[in-house]
Amino acid sequence: MTPGEVRRLYFIIRTFLSYGLDELIPKMRITLPLRLWRYSLFWMPNRHKDKPLGERLRLALQELGPVWIKFGQMLSTRRDLFPPQIADQLALLQDKVAPFDGALAKAQIEEAMGGLPVEEWFDDFDIQPLASASIAQVHTARLKSNGKEVVIKVIRPDILPVIKADLKLIYRLARWVPRLLPDGRRLRPTEVVREYEKTLIDELNLLRESANAIQLRRNFENSPMLYVPEVYSDYCSQDMMVMERIYGIPVSDVATLEKNGTNMKLLAERGVQVFFTQVFRDSFFHADMHPGNIFVSYEHPENPKYIGIDCGIVGSLNKEDKRYLAENFIAFFNRDYRKVAELHVDSGWVPPDTNVEEFEFAIRTVCEPIFEKPLAEISFGHVLLNLFNTARRFNMEVQPQLVLLQKTLLYVEGVGRQLYPQLDLWKTAKPFLESWIKDQVGIPALTRALKEKAPFWVEKMPEIPELVYDSLRQGKYLQHSVDKIARELQENHVRQGQSRYLLGIGATLLLSGTFLLVSRPEWGLMPCWLMAGGLVAWLIGWRKTR
């Protein structure tokens, strides 16, 4: 490790211990070496004993910086992993991150706009940030060109070196995991960190986020379910993004939603519909749908509409992944575990030599207890989590797009059941999945595929005769080459047979001549002739092997 990495590691350990986060480790897992190591750091006591554990965890992650804050944001929706008091504190990381100086933000905006003063492009620029996140900060203004209210998102200054330094350290730690944990190699920690790095680096490029938001807005144009604010791409750069300012109720503010008369059941169901529409219709889904990025319009509470922001992380599935995923869900809820196992093999998610019977039994063992709950209480996200964890025991490769999907599905479920605890995800999603699968087979699907491919075939039609001629010529040449190789192999086989025969004869004559020369000297030159013949036969046989 470099001196800088050692200092950073020391800071991380000191931060964790000063907030007493060693309490998160179960006592049964604290081995003697760990206990001795903790005693050796006696000068790092818990300095926040008066605070609850959840608050201490939040403050520690906040102190460690953006890499750890994003990690905490991801964990905030995993209420199956933490008690409510910890999950509630982690959720605060989404909205309450200390802002950086507004003057620095203004300077960055001016640099992005070619060095011109902010007043040349915007009116009513507010130096006080509207919101502050782990990666970026948002300020409000009005466009000078048309007077529309906008928000300006700017990346935190000098954030990239900090992220890279932390990620480099995490990579080093990840390489130790297989040595420290018996199951560490199968977890592929380095690949997990690599995917996490890609996600973080992508979030630092606001041009990418702008393009994502424009695409998502186009996909849901005039939709009654989701509104995506307009992006003013002429003002956007890698470090700055300008988009329409929206007014809505945070989706986590259930009390205000109810006070506004929102149809909570319809709102929860529309969240599920929006997610499955993005995944299966558009193959392009918002993959960071935590409560801080979702609002609900004040207008028409009886027919509520979501407002989505922060499109820095998106995911996509190819056609085959979508089909296998939809069929997996339906097979699972029909308790057809054999079908689930076969789908994993057919899709290539697990190796083709996987024992399907063993895989089916493993899935049944893990998933059957889920059905002890009423169907309405079964979590899609946990279904995927259980399936993927089981499949990883059978050497399932890490599928980044499926990891993003599973994480997003947990977000959607968490929000939906917070809005309407009786939400039946399966009842809401099943018609959509069955309709989508039905749409992928039969005459309509064939007609659609022909329409999609028609321009390609029209373009390639003039080339077909030449391609056919080239193919026939190559086939003829290939056949000639195959025949030539076959003849050479046959000739080589014959030569090898002759060589072995002559070598055997030569060895026999040499041995016989030597024996007679020693035991029957009265035979005169006969043994010498035998030895000479054997040597000639052996030399001829040896040459045939060349």
Swiss-Prot record:
The gene is ubiB. It comes from Citrobacter koseri (strain ATCC BAA-895 / CDC 4225-83 / SGSC4696). Is probably a protein kinase regulator of UbiI activity which is involved in aerobic coenzyme Q (ubiquinone) biosynthesis. GO terms for cellular component: plasma membrane. ATP binds at L130, A131, S132, A133, S134, I135, A136, Q137, V138, K153. The chain crosses the membrane at residues 501-521, 522-542. This is Probable protein kinase UbiB. Keywords: ATP-binding, Cell inner membrane, Cell membrane, Kinase, Membrane, Nucleotide-binding, Transferase, Transmembrane, Transmembrane helix, Ubiquinone biosynthesis. The active site is at D288. It is an enzyme of class 2 (transferase). Its main location: membrane. It is found in: Cell inner membrane.
